[in-house]
Structures are given as structure tokens and as C-alpha cells.
């Protein structure tokens, strides 16, 4: 059974010992959510808190990374549970919104955000191409 929980510094170190390249994503005043199967971390979400300037003048959580490591566990609700956990944390911390950036071609990620009632705003480049979408959830 998969357990979703607030991650600890120990959990973060367990992740980094197995996936050292993830260290570049763990920055800022962050929150870690992990998905565990027994003692095995099978997924995680990292979001950092940052200020939003005028006209909002509030704080948001920006999701830097969300991943379910094992392909056979993807599309089984683990990502949704981690997103719901970060929404719960953000509400408790009284932030204004949660946002993330998604590559346009990542269709399964777009489905995850829509399922969790995030708005999707494609970012059109000067050449007319849409390279990324920003997703947002106002609390």
C-alpha cells in the first residue's frame, strides 16, 4: 500500500542517496511530499515557497518537481495524492496559490493538473510556438 506523507530531512537524504541528480531541485523554502511503498520511496513532490509581487502581494508554492519513479505505478493516483497533500500543506500555511510549469508535450502531466482542478495557461513564445504551460490553483 502506498503511503503519502510530509517528507523529512531524512527522507530527502534517502532520495538524494538514490538519485543524486535531484539535488538541483531542492532549493528555497521548500516542502517535500513523498510516496512510500513500505520503506521504498516511489515518488516525491518538491515545492518551494516564494513571494508574488504586486498586485497580489502574497506568497505561493511553486512545484519544482513531481515524479513517480516506477512506470508501473504511474497513472494510479499517486501523483494526485501528492498534489492533494501539497494543497493541504499550502492551505495550512495560508499561501495564495500553488503553481507549476509543464512542458507542452507532457500530456499525462496536464491531465494530472486538470484532474486536481488547476487552471492551465499556455505560454506562447514570440515565434508563436507554445513551449510550456503554467498551471495554477488559487486557494
Language-model features and meaning:
Residues 2, 6-71, 89, 138:
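Acetyl-CoA-dependent GNAT
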Residues 24-25, 35-36, 80, 86, ...:
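Preference for well-ordered, secondary-structure-rich cores of eukaryotic proteins
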Residues 33, 122-139:
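C-terminal "cap" of GNAT-fold acetyltransferases
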Residues 68, 75-88, 111, 115:
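Conserved acetyl-CoA-binding loop-helix of GNAT-fold acetyltransferases
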Residues 90-102:
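Conserved GNAT acetyl-CoA-binding A-motif
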Residues 104-122:
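Conserved active-site alpha-helix within GNAT-family acetyltransferase domains
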